[in-house]
């Protein structure tokens, strides 16, 4: 516990918060180019082939981003938009690719939670 005199001499230092998505550089989204599109296996209790992409961002970082939804059209040199948000069972994946923007197509035949997957409204007869 500091004395009053010590507080006058040097004030208390504020805690600096560490960001969970440093590659975004305080922006909500960043554009990037896919350098590799592949599948990855999740951590211990889960089993799947999760679709991920290695992306070189305009901020100069190269990050691993998750491709949400069923099926995708991404390949090497595709231009994508990424947002923050980790995938709990994939170590090192701290970003999501935004579906339905730039070169990323929306999910086909999606009727619920469409806005999260860039799917257009289906034609109702």
Curated annotation (Swiss-Prot):
- What does this protein do, in the record's words? With S4 and S5 plays an important role in translational accuracy.
Family from the record: Belongs to the universal ribosomal protein uS12 family.
Please report the name of this protein according to its UniProt entry.
Small ribosomal subunit protein uS12
Q: Which GO-annotated molecular functions does the record name?
A: rRNA binding; structural constituent of ribosome; tRNA binding
The subunit structure is: Part of the 30S ribosomal subunit. Contacts proteins S8 and S17. May interact with IF1 in the 30S initiation complex.
Does the keyword section mention ATP-binding?
Answer: no
GO cellular component, alphabetical, reads: small ribosomal subunit
Task: Report the PANTHER family cross-referenced here.
Answer: 30S RIBOSOMAL PROTEIN S12 FAMILY MEMBER
Residues spanning the signal sequence: none
Q: Does the keyword Translocase apply?
A: no
**Mind listing the GO biological process terms from this record?**
translation
Which NCBIfam families did the record assign?
Answer: rpsL_bact
Spell out the residue ranges making up region: Disordered: 104-125
Among Gene3D superfamilies, the record links this protein to: Nucleic acid-binding proteins
Residues bearing 3-methylthioaspartic acid are: 89
UniProt keyword annotations, A-Z: Methylation, Ribonucleoprotein, Ribosomal protein, RNA-binding, rRNA-binding, tRNA-binding
Superkingdom of the source species: Bacteria
InterPro entries the record matches: NA-bd_OB-fold, Ribosomal_uS12, Ribosomal_uS12_bac
